[in-house]
Amino acid sequence: MARRCTLTFKGSMIGNHVSHANNKNKRRLLPNLRSIKIQLDDGTTRRIKVAASTLRTMRKGA
């Protein structure tokens, strides 16, 4: 399964490890995903993966 937020579609990015000697090596920057249970309108619960920043926004709105 992809490392992607199911609500905002935030995914991984490509960056560099930079050493003190300014050597650069490729790395992946992964989103901070959390698995939460959410209740749908019909009463069923479903488990989804959400980024931590999205979870903060959801809690602020509630």
Swiss-Prot record:
Task: Please verify whether the record's keywords include Membrane.
Answer: no
Q: What SUPFAM superfamilies does the database record attribute to this sequence?
A: L28p-like (SSF143800)
The terms under GO molecular function for this entry are:
structural constituent of ribosome
Pfam families in the cross-refs? Ribosomal_L28
Keywords, in A-Z order: Ribonucleoprotein, Ribosomal protein
Keyword Ribosomal protein attributed: yes
Question: What Gene3D superfamilies does the entry give?
Answer: Ribosomal protein L28/L24
Q: Which family does it belong to?
A: Belongs to the bacterial ribosomal protein bL28 family.
Name the UniProt record assigns to this protein: Large ribosomal subunit protein bL28
Which species is listed as the source? Helicobacter acinonychis (strain Sheeba)
